Design a protein with these regions (language model features):
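Cys-nucleophile CN-hydrolase/nitrilase-fold catalytic domain and related Cys-dependent amidase chemistry
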Residues: 52-174, 243-266, 272-275, 428-431, ...
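Bacterial N-terminal signal peptides that target proteins for export
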Residues: 1-7
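Conserved beta-strand scaffold positions in the cores of enzyme catalytic domains, especially
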Residues: 30-32, 267-269, 282
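N-terminal signal peptide
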Residues: 10-28
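C-terminal beta-strand edge segments of enzyme domains
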Residues: 271-530
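Active-site catalytic loop in hydrolytic enzyme cores
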Residues: 117-119, 125-137, 143-236, 240-257, ...
Length: 530
């Protein structure tokens, strides 16, 4: 999970550019389901196994229905959300009746549907296995898992003699368990233990090759996902999550899209639907396009199904089939465009801007900042103390620094329908609220009001159309580029990449919705423990 909630209208959108894959290239059909979880009304109170099964079967009934619907639409793999079978907020003792032991598929080959009596107390595994087997589909689900340990052998073994894990389980299309992943980066999950060592879990399908597995809060950390992508060459990922949205930088679909685009991967992201907790936002993302769903008003689930290109390098033929595979975190154009080396970071001078559309205002700025050089100020964004400068006028060239880390922005407003304040912010430091991780962030944000103190607050809507070129002096190669439009409209940079002197940049022109956020979100993983 991450952070806190907000409200926005229903959004189920296909975001697409020109796809670089030929029609005769290998493809497959994937599905994700955003599930409204039937919750335990008192998760801190222990229950009998029969009551736990009765509760979980209510959610599994929905899984069974949605798996059949996905299969009818040709889906070969389906992903369900984190916590979607059992719910949230258990204690270590109150979750006991919900636990099952998921065997290691590297040691045990087992289809719970075909051999239901091999292991006891595995009713949930049996139902999931039969869903996969009946519908001839790979199925990814998340469930609580118990693994017995011996404190005489394992010094990290908990006092009660068992690990309790937040676990993703993958079933093949014949119901066999083919992968098991224990979530590494827990988010206020008192019922669960982190695994004693990092797990790098993959599984192989006959239709698309290899997939990697990770869960929710893992997406903000190096292990395991960056290792899966950069060191192991995984380009397709399944991602159960129970993510609480927080703007302006970490709404679920916003960061899912940024991660897929910047890491150069396919991401199958299934989130929980829970309005009271601000949970929504699922999607099927590739580096070039996305089918996603965001609904902060209704309470119904949502099935997404999409045909995708195979991105596993190990199953693609040499030559044209691999030519468009992306190097993770290298940046790339949205469509295939020939670019000379000298043009990769074009100066784009203000004097070259085309005439602006007429409008009621030349672009709002605080009265004290309507000068040639805007005055830096500080404001809290995502619990961090950002240094910002306000945008003024219709076009300009700004720089803002937090210590030696600097962000630069060249902008022009094509339309300003009403008074809206924008600011460019920089942050270089250790984030310590709801997790500890080191950030270098450049963010162009629409402020929630007309006062500087409102810059960094949560808003989903904007009317101002902004063309921009942004770059920052990052010390890390792990920079996630993202653009978010009004009404939770996902956008993407026209191009992004590394310029001279360690500067990472992105450019976007011609947006048709107002700009809410444009962000270069740098993660300095090696500084997390400072």
């Amino acid at each position: 999970m991450a952070l806190c909630g907000f409200a926005a209208p229903i959004l189920a959108v296909l975001l697409s550019g020109i796809h670089p894959v030929r029609a005769d290239d290998p493809s497959y059909v994937a599905a994700v389901y955003e599930h409204r979880v039937v919750l335990n009304p008192d998760p801190r109170e222990p229950v009998e196994r029969s009551a736990a099964l009765e509760h979980m079967n209510k959610n599994l009934d929905v899984f069974e229905e949605q798996t059949a619907l996905a299969a009818k639409q040709g889906a070969q793999i389906i992903v369900f959300p984190e916590d979607a079978i059992h719910g949230f907020n258990y204690t270590r003792s109150s979750i006991a009746s919900y636990l099952e032991t998921v065997p290691d598929p590297g040691r045990v080959t087992w289809s719970p549907c075909a051999d239901p009596d091999r292991f006891q107390n595995t009713e949930v595994l049996h139902r999931l296995s039969c869903m996969a087997r009946k519908n001839h589909i790979f199925l990814v689900a998340n469930m609580p898992d118990r693994q017995v340990c011996d404190r005489l052998v394992d010094p990290l073994c908990p006092l009660d003699g068992q690990y309790q894990f937040n676990t993703d389980v993958v079933f093949s299309d014949n119901g066999t368990i083919v992968a098991r992943y224990h979530k590494q980066n827990l988010y206020f999950e008192a019922a669960f233990d982190a695994p004693p060592k990092h797990e790098y879990v993959t599984f192989t399908t006959p239709f698309a090759g290899r997939f990697g597995v990770f869960t929710c809060f893992d997406i903000l950390f190096r292990e395991p996902v960056v290792t899966l992508v950069k060191d192991m060459g995984i380009r397709q990922l399944v991602y159960p999550t129970a993510w609480m949205n927080q703007l302006p930088l970490l709404a679920a679909v916003q960061f899912q899209c940024s991660f897929s685009y910047s890491a150069g991967v396919t991401l199958l992201a299934a989130n929980v639907r829970a309005a009271a907790l601000g949970m929504t936002g699922s999607g099927i993302f590739t580096p070039w396009d996305a089918l996603h769903h965001h609904d902060a008003v209704g309470e119904t689930g949502k099935l997404l199904v999409k045909r995708l290109p195979v991105l596993d390098p190990s199953v693609l033929e040499d030559g044209a089939g691999k030519a468009w595979l992306l190097v993770p975190f290298s940046g790339h154009p949205k469509v295939e465009v020939a670019v000379e080396e000298s043009e990769k970071e074009e100066p784009w001078p203000v004097s070259s801007f085309s005439p602006m559309q007429s409008g009621p205002e030349p672009g709002y700025c605080p009265k004290e900042d309507c000068t040639e050089e805007p005055i830096p100020f500080t404001s809290t964004m995502m619990y961090d103390n950002f240094t910002l400068v306000a945008l003024q006028g219709r076009e300009g060239n700004l720089t803002v620094c937090d210590g030696s880390f600097c962000c630069h922005l060249l902008f022009r407003r094509r339309r300003t329908a009403k008074r809206e304040l924008y600011a460019l912010g920089a942050f270089d430091g250790l984030h310590v609220v709801h997790g500890t991780y080191y950030l270098e962030v450049c963010a162009l944000v629409r402020c929630t009001g007309l006062e500087k103190e409102s810059c960094g607050g949560e808003t989903e809507h904007a009317q101002t159309l902004v063309d921009f070129h942004m770059h920052g002096t990052f010390s890390t190669e792990h920079v996630y580029a993202g653009v978010l439009g009004s009404g939770m409209t996902l956008d993407r940079p026209d191009r992004s990449g590394w310029g001279s002197k360690g500067r990472f940049y992105m450019t976007r022109t011609g947006m048709t919705t107002g700009l809410v956020t444009a962000v270069l979100y740098g993660r300095v993983y090696e500084e997390d423990s400072m």
